[in-house]
Each structure stands twice: as structure tokens, then as C-alpha cells.
Amino acid sequence: MRAERLSPLLALGLLVAGIRSVHCLPENVVVKDRHRRVDGHTLASSNTDFAFSLYKQLALKNPNKNVMFSPLSVSMALAFLSLGARGPTLTEILEGLKFNLTEIQETQIHQGFQHLLQALNRPRNQLQLSVGNAMFVQEELKLLDKFIEDARVLYSSEAFPTNFRDPEAAKSLINDYVKNKTQGKIEELFKDLSPRTELVLVNYVYFKAQWKTRFDPKHTEQAEFHVSDNKTVEVPMMTLDLETPYFRDEELGCTLVELTYTSNDSALFILPDKGKMQDLEAKLTPEMLTRWRNSLQPRRIHELYLPKFSIKSNYELNDTLSQMGIKKIFTDADLSGITGTADLVVSQVVHGAALDVDEEGTEGAAATGIGIERTFLRIIVRVNRPFLIAVVLKDTQSIIFLGKVTNPSEA
């Protein structure tokens, strides 16, 4: 029997152009506060805050559509860029990432991402997870030695000389790299490149895991999914009887079900009551997520209905990030920490993601029965209307994937 699996694949690219070529546009980090431990957990709260802020912007710009992205990928790419930012540009990036610079220093932020990368890329028996960064640099562009070293040590970044004056060849080089790193799931991160491009920073994430309690493909049947009041589509609906963390939030009008993987990481499915999606989206905060996670209790769900879906997304984030307060990188940036001169601006930020829930993969382990509280109430959860999903890595509490499924039948 094959196990149902969840496979998010993600990539983000930051495209940096040189003002001088455009003419039309003008191993360890030493931190001062040695008593404060800086690791992946240090970033969790800020990253979650950034995740929900970005989600709200994308949902606003894409009403009644599927929304899929990796908060981790976007925040890591911007933090990577901030290595070369100076002055107000640096402050704007870090504050846009929801860091309180009166409480945490820049060096601590980079060290936190360094530890997070190391934690994410540790070998795992039950999980395929790969996270990384890369720089594609115009052949004659001279980068500062410190930037190259910091990029390598803190963000494990590879660097590739690239001829952007031949934009088609450069595009193929970058897209092929991302395609390879995401196991072929993201084929075209960049649809076009300008010959004036000087530098492209790329972050990618590949994640594949099997459910701890498997779905039986023989029980998957076509069923109705209510996209809206006046639109219904037929989708393959999986079904399962299991014991798993569950919470019914009467205050916000939603039902939460957490499904765990064999790696003990998890996917949190948030199903708003009919007509409650916008109210719920408006109230998404790190505090709300903490309340939900603390309220989840093991319950027997007699019938869980969950749609299969395969969704790809591609976003250009320039306007979105500007509305979130990260503006200077696109106009009057000071990225002098990259080359030593302030003549670079970011011309394009693109993000691609693909999320598959399907029947491939190996058999999952049996569900544990530790501390299960049985109830005589028969719980039935039908995920047959738009819902939210958050994939959370247990050891770092990082939201690696966040999205809204409005229509599972749309790729």
C-alpha cells in the first residue's frame, strides 16, 4: 500500500541590477551579547509574524484564488540580501522581516539563520528536506571578499559566474539549477531576465514526507468541494479514521486538524466555518497560532475527508514587499556591502512554489496511541470548502509552507 504524502517545493529569486549599467536609475558569527543563545528558535516568532503578514498581502492580491508560498524561503532570501545592505536599507529589510532591532542585533539574526540552515539540512531518516542559497554573479562584477565569505559561512551559498548579457542563457542556467534542486517541481522560476542584471540571489526549499497514519487510496472517491456559494467542483477526496490532534475553535468559528508525518513534523489544516474565511484571515497572528497549537488535543476523528490537490504558484513580490515596508531595495538602495559601491538595486523578487498531496511514497508508520483521550462524541471533519494549511517543522517551529486552498482542482 502506498502512503499519502505532502510534497512542498519552493524557490525564491532576488534579481539585482546595476544602476551604472541601467543609467535610467540613478564559520561563526561573534555576537556582542554572548549570553543570549541564538538558534533557529530565536527566529521562529519573527518568521511567523512575517509569514502571516505576507500571507494577508498575497490573499488580498489574489482573492478567491489558491495561495501557496514558503515564508521561510522568502525571509531567508531577504536576510541573505541584507548581508550587503547598509544604513536605512538594512534597517528597512530587517524591520520588514518583523525583527525588533532594539532586542536583537543584526549579527544575531544572521547567526540564527545559520543555525536554522544547519538544523534543516541535518540528515533525516524519515524526511527529505533540502534548503539552500545560491548567487549568480555577472562575470566581471567584483564582489567584496567579506560578502562572499559571509554568504558562504552564514547562508551556505554557492556562487556561479553568469553572463547576463546573454539573458536567455542566464535564465536557463538559473532555472535549471532551481529545477535540479527542487527535484523537477519548479521548472521556470524566472520567465525572463534583463541583460542589465548584475546579480541573482536564489533560495530553494525541497520537502517531501509521508503521513504517519496513511490514507488508503481505495477509499479515495470523487466528491463535491464548495469553492464558493455559487461554484462547486468535483475533486478526489481522501478519507481516514484516525486519532490525531484536533481543536474546535468556537470563538473564531473554525476547526483545526493536525496531521503528523513519520518525521514528527506536521501539517495544520484550518477549516473556517462557511463564510468565515475573511474574518479568520484578518485575525491570523503568531499569538493566535500559539493559542491553537496549545489547544490541540488528541481526538478520535471517525471520518476525516481531505481533498487531493496539486497546486503551483509564481509571484512577483516587488509591490507586495513594498507595501510591507521593504521599499528602498527597489529604488534608492544602499547595497554597498556587496560590491563596495552603492550602485545596485533589486529589480525583481520572484517566488515559486508547488504543493502536492498525492498517493505516492512509501508506507507510513502506524499511529501512536500515547495519551489518547477517547470521546463518545462522533467527530466528522469534511474539508470540502476553502481551507488554510501550514506545514511546520517540529525541531525549529519554522513555518516552511503556508497557503490557502480555494479550489483543489486548479493546478
From Swiss-Prot:
Chief subcellular location: cytoplasm
Residue positions the entry lists as glycosylated: 100, 180, 230, 264, 318
Stored Pfam families: Serpin
Gene3D superfamilies: Alpha-1-antitrypsin, domain 1 (2.30.39.10), Antithrombin, subunit I, domain 2 (3.30.497.10)
InterPro entries named among the record's database cross-references: Serpin_CS, Serpin_dom, Serpin_fam, Serpin_sf, Serpin_sf_1, Serpin_sf_2
Molecular function as annotated in GO: serine-type endopeptidase inhibitor activity
Subcellular locations according to the entry: Cytoplasmic vesicle, Secretory vesicle, Chromaffin granule; Secreted
Keywords of the record: Cytoplasmic vesicle, Glycoprotein, Protease inhibitor, Secreted, Serine protease inhibitor, Signal
Any one annotated GO CC term: extracellular space
Annotated signal peptide: 1-24
Site residues (Reactive bond), renumbered to this chain: 377-378
Protein role: Serine protease inhibitor. Strongly inhibits elastase and trypsin stoichiometrically at the molar ratio of 1:1. Acts as a moderate inhibitor of plasmin and chymotrypsin. Does not inhibit thrombin, urokinase, kallikrein, tissue plasminogen activator, cathepsin G or the cysteine proteases papain, cathepsin B or cathepsin L.
PANTHER family noted in UniProt: ALPHA-1-ANTICHYMOTRYPSIN, SERINE PROTEASE INHIBITOR, SERPIN
Family note: Belongs to the serpin family.
Complex and partners: Homodimer.
Name of protein: Serpin A3-3
Name of the gene: SERPINA3-3
